């Protein structure tokens, strides 16, 4: 591979599709970053709602902003396009409908240089728009770097944000500054699967020498409602994501070493996705007949999933160890799900309506 040239300290890659209502604010957040030596790469994934015109307004004003427009190819292809055009020493991937504090790039870049780290992770907020509730990642990061493999194993424990006392690394991408050379030299590409972030984060951790952390809350991810059909179908598609992860571990020669961790991860991954889809359905349907129909469909899909031989194999393995190292809420919910998908859905709705809001 040719030597990688760094024209900027950081390349900010913002991918968007029909984000006219939110894109202006996000680009402003990127422009107003206190780190001056940066470029902003805007990838339009076939928008038709005026998003491209908003992006062009900023590109015409600032020389460090570049726009690339393509037919609708999905988030993974958009991010790869952004990476191919980037010239920064580090890259960061932001979504076109979120918000960022102005010092994020400067703080993360300075930590990366101080520690000579390949990746720097930060804290974040999740904003549930449907119920107007803002939550933050609860666990403090360590004040020392980890090796990439240590961060990877921690991620397998945590899944996304089950908030165990020893587990703090999560599989989101927008909170992480990544050395561009790490991605390019290892030919790491985005996978066209659901929850592509966690697959990508696994890959970069496995190739990283050092991962650092900052405890600042810089990024706010807004959880918006998707379509009901896609919210249920994502459960079917999750098996492909898990197969991709298993293939990755085998390719790296660490599947046997991590097999027990992976089985627990498998269960918590399905728990996280199913729990999130129940949230989407709970807060996005006002018509009682439609609500009941989708609820029945979801219960049917959950019955299919728990009937998978892989699911039962992982469940029996975790059960044999008393569900050790699986966090309390996932542990309870997985037991309920394995007993009755209907009870699992009803209890999940109860938790959302009476606990998440408070």
Curated annotation (Swiss-Prot):
GO MF, any single term: glycosyltransferase activity
GO BP, one annotated term: lipid metabolic process
Pfam families given in the database record: Glycos_transf_2
Enzyme class: transferase
Highest taxon, organism lineage: Bacteria
Keywords assigned by UniProt, alphabetized: Glycosyltransferase, Lipid biosynthesis, Lipid metabolism, Transferase
Pathway this chain belongs to: Glycolipid biosynthesis
EC number, as in UniProt: 2.4.1.-
SUPFAM superfamilies the UniProt entry points to: Nucleotide-diphospho-sugar transferases
Observed effect of gene inactivation: Mutations in the predicted active site result in a recombinant protein that is unable to catalyze the formation of the cholesterol glycolipid.
Catalytic activity: cholesterol + UDP-alpha-D-galactose = cholesteryl 3-beta-D-galactoside + UDP + H(+)
Its biological purpose: Galactosyltransferase involved in the synthesis of cholesterol glycolipids, which are formed by the use of host-derived cholesterol and have been shown to be immunogenic, and possibly contribute to Lyme disease pathogenesis. Catalyzes the formation of cholesteryl beta-D-galactopyranoside (CGal) from cholesterol and UDP-alpha-D-galactose. Cannot use GDP-mannose.
Family from the record: Belongs to the glycosyltransferase 2 family.
Name of the protein in question: Cholesterol galactosyltransferase
Organism whose genome encodes this protein: Borreliella burgdorferi (strain ATCC 35210 / DSM 4680 / CIP 102532 / B31)
